[in-house]
C-alpha cells in the first residue's frame, strides 16, 4: 500500500548532489519555499495598505499619499526582508530590535551549517566566500572578484565553495549576459557574475545597517542602495 507523506527540510540540494545518494525517481513532488515577497509582507503587516496596493492597475497615477506610504513600506521591507519568523514577529510586536536578533540568529545558524555539512578541507573557503559577500556587493559594480577574498585567489580554488552555497539555497548566482536574447544561457558569461543573498533583510543585517537607517533612508540610500535594490529585485 502506498502512503502520501509530506516532508520538510533544508539543504536538500546539497544532499541530493552527494555522490551515491539514492532517490525515488518519479515518486516525489517538490515545492520550494522562499522568503516572503514584498506583496506577501504587506499582507502580513498592513492589510489596509495591502488592499490599496492590490487595487493599483497601472491605468491611473498612484495617489501621492499612497505612493509615500508604499515607499516607506518598501524601505522597511529592505531592512526586514521576508524570512517568515522575522515577518511574523514584526507583525505581532513591531519591535525592530527583536527582528534584528532573529536575523542575526539565522545568519549564525547558516555558519553552523557550514561546519556541520561541509568537508573539512572546504570549510575555510566557504566561510571566506560567505564573509566577503557584503563587501562584494558594496562595490560600485558589485561584480564578484576572487581577489577580494584573498590576494592571488583563483576561480578553481573557490568554485566548489560557491556551488555549495548555491545548492544550499543561501545565495544565488547571477551570470552576466552579453546580449539580451533568448535563450539567455547561450549568452551567459560564467566568469563574470554576482552573488546575492536569499533574503534582502539578511543582506541588510550583514551590512550592519540599523532599522533607523532603513526608515530614514540616509545610509541605506547612499552607500548601499544599489546592492539592496538589486537583491530586492532578485528576490
Residue ranges and their predicted role:
Residues 2-7:
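Loop/turn-to-beta-strand initiation segments
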Residues 9-10, 15-138:
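Interdomain motor-coupling "hinge/lid" segment immediately C-terminal to the ATP-binding subdomain
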Residues 87-235:
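Accessory nucleic acid-recognition modules appended to NTPase machines
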Amino acid at each position: 500500500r502506498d502512503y502520501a507523506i509530506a516532508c520538510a527540510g533544508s539543504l536538500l540540494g546539497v544532499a541530493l548532489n552527494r555522490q551515491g545518494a539514492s532517490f525515488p525517481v518519479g515518486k516525489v513532488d517538490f515545492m520550494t519555499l522562499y522568503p516572503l515577497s514584498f506583496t506577501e509582507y504587506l499582507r502580513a503587516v498592513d492589510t489596509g495598505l495591502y488592499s490599496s496596493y492590490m487595487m493599483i492597475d497601472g491605468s491611473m497615477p498612484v495617489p501621492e499619499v499612497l505612493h509615500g506610504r508604499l515607499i516607506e513600506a518598501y524601505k522597511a521591507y529592505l531592512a526586514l526582508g521576508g524570512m517568515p519568523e522575522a515577518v511574523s514577529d514584526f507583525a505581532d510586536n513591531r519591535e525592530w530590535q527583536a527582528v534584528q536578533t532573529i536575523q542575526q540568529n539565522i545568519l549564525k545558524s547558516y555558519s553552523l551549517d557550514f561546519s556541520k555539512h561541509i568537508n573539512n578541507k572546504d570549510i575555510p573557503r566557504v566561510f571566506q566566500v560567505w564573509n566577503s559577500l557584503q563587501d562584494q556587493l558594496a562595490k560600485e559594480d558589485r561584480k564578484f572578484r576572487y581577489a577580494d577574498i584573498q590576494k592571488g585567489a583563483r576561480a578553481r580554488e573557490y568554485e566548489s565553495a560557491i556551488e555549495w552555497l548555491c545548492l544550499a539555497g543561501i545565495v544565488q548566482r547571477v551570470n552576466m549576459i552579453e546580449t539580451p536574447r533568448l535563450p539567455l544561457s547561450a549568452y551567459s558569461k560564467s566568469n563574470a557574475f554576482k552573488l546575492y543573498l536569499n533574503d534582502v533583510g539578511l543582506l541588510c543585517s550583514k551590512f550592519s545597517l540599523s532599522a533607523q537607517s532603513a526608515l530614514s533612508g540616509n545610509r541605506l540610500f547612499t552607500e548601499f542602495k544599489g546592492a539592496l535594490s538589486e537583491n530586492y529585485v532578485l528576490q
